Amino acid sequence: MRALCVKKVCGFLSKLSLRSSISCRRYYGDKIPNYGSYRRGFSNEEALILRRLSEGGLVHARHLLDKIPQRGSINRVVYWTSLLSKYAKTGYLDEARVLFEVMPERNIVTCNAMLTGYVKCRRMNEAWTLFREMPKNVVSWTVMLTALCDDGRSEDAVELFDEMPERNVVSWNTLVTGLIRNGDMEKAKQVFDAMPSRDVVSWNAMIKGYIENDGMEEAKLLFGDMSEKNVVTWTSMVYGYCRYGDVREAYRLFCEMPERNIVSWTAMISGFAWNELYREALMLFLEMKKDVDAVSPNGETLISLAYACGGLGVEFRRLGEQLHAQVISNGWETVDHDGRLAKSLVHMYASSGLIASAQSLLNESFDLQSCNIIINRYLKNGDLERAETLFERVKSLHDKVSWTSMIDGYLEAGDVSRAFGLFQKLHDKDGVTWTVMISGLVQNELFAEAASLLSDMVRCGLKPLNSTYSVLLSSAGATSNLDQGKHIHCVIAKTTACYDPDLILQNSLVSMYAKCGAIEDAYEIFAKMVQKDTVSWNSMIMGLSHHGLADKALNLFKEMLDSGKKPNSVTFLGVLSACSHSGLITRGLELFKAMKETYSIQPGIDHYISMIDLLGRAGKLKEAEEFISALPFTPDHTVYGALLGLCGLNWRDKDAEGIAERAAMRLLELDPVNAPGHVALCNVYAGLGRHDMEKEMRKEMGIKGVKKTPGCSWVVVNGRANVFLSGDKSASEAAQMVLPIFCGNEMLEEEEEKPLSLCHC
């Protein structure tokens, strides 16, 4: 009995909860199919009107409208207008248009609602037709102004603005914002200056525009001129400073903010993360959570935190897992409307070495960008097999990013043939793909093939990237192939309009000419450079130093300091090398001291070896040995190898034999089969006439199996480098190649009997 009673009560409550829906169905009958689909977001009567409008039942729709009672003080036309706007915003524009036609009454607000619906749905022909026929106010004109700006028709927008019979601050702001959005900052500034009155929105629009169009200095000036700032203003400036890398100033401004919202916090957290200050990003997030007026993170906050956790690497992988757990437990994944949060989590796991977790996320929701992230991580770990397996899933899509990643992976592994095979199969290759292939050929020392591929790239109608040229110039410099370097320089001049003064490219040209022995050409390019960075100065100083032009190198170093550029460790390596090759001991010691004390640059092992070389070349072997004894670290084989080599140069020094033997003993303790060390000691003994010791050392080399790597030389003929090893029987072939180039065939016949001397490296 009790069970029956409970059942009846439950049935009653169920019926009661459905009374409204049932009564509607009884009144209109069950002839309306898919009634439920029209209920989403609408009341019963709104859904029924929408259905009738959709079916063309205008009489029924009008009947329903007339039956709607006046709701309190709300006029019926206001309600109808609100309903029309609601239909238009939710995608039922045709139904909204029919409603507009059947409405018993309309006013200008109704017309503006319909006009806005047309514009938002990009039905511009209908929008213009209505605009021409309807009564207009400032809102109507502003709606059409927005439409023109959204279409990128800035000039038409300005013309329409000039025709407006009346304007308000919203109209002015709409035009300013539209011009900025279309990249016309100059015109936007003119309109901004002409505004009769400005509000904070006007100022914020200009500040944001300057920040996004490389005008941070102008944004700073406007920010300083503003009498009234709001949270948007402050947040824009924080974002701007972070965007341009001045995180310290961004944080100072953030701390001064009178109020903050989630966007402000996120701007600063993101700024830390994108500038690789990952710990600071996480610490600021914790501070945000402790704030009295704590705010919930949004999607951008979580994305930045995920990248910060990934940036901290393997050691902080647990932190990333905790973040993911928080995302799930707090339901934050529901804010990931565009999938960017999921991608950032994949990146986080991949960067932290938890590739299985990244792969698991990918399997839950496959995404091409996430797939590329994991492929890159597999390749970085040298796991070609897993990268290939994942690549097979996206191979048919011919996505350039994934294909280029695999090409790069094969090249890194030295598998040039597979890389080139994939390169040839990829349709619609872009400049990045070509550059990766060319760079890989250079990396695998296939310099002629790399230069040939550049020619193919140009023939295909693609303009090489500056990075492409830089790679090839680097290869020309590495092989001292001046002809190839000049050829690339000519291609640059032909393919780059008005010779784009790219700093990296100019630096590469300076370096290439210097390494190829054309120091005057290098200096000519350097002297014409409008902008010079530290790399520019370093390339030229190193070039002069390697050519034995110590005075010019040191004078250029002084010019660099006078220009306000700060030297770095590479700069000092160049000037110390210059001093070493010219025997300028006092100057070298002064520079070494200034490096540490004046510029607070910690010397590296190369700097210490330069100082050893400086002392040794000046014949001060004992001082060089004492210098090594005072080093702030335990010397390795390169240090003792340098000293041993200097003993070979100074074998006449009375201390040479003892120093050489001590250096060799330490060197061979560290590296028992070090070939250069054995050979250097043999040379010292030979110079001193100690042939018995030399013979003993060579015998020891034989027992240990120590073999000196033969020196090599090369000559470029018809664009191809021909390499010859020391002691190679093909030396006569080298003679046949080189002599016609320098002497001509007739001279070759005359000099046929004379031996050919080649430079070895």
Swiss-Prot record:
GO MF: RNA binding
What positions does the transit peptide occupy in this chain? 1-28
The keyword Signal appears for this protein: no
Query: Could you tell me the Gene Ontology terms of the biological process aspect for this record?
Result: mitochondria-nucleus signaling pathway; plant organ morphogenesis; RNA modification
Q: Which GO terms describe its cellular component?
A: mitochondrion
Q: Which Pfam families match?
A: E_motif (PF20431), PPR (PF01535), PPR_2 (PF13041)
Residue windows of the PPR repeats: 76-110, 111-136, 137-171, 172-198, 199-229, 230-264, 265-291, 298-334, 338-364, 367-397, 399-429, 430-464, 465-495, 502-532, 533-567, 568-598, 604-634
Which stretches of sequence are listed as region Type E motif? Answer: 639-718
What's the protein here called? Pentatricopeptide repeat-containing protein At1g32415, mitochondrial
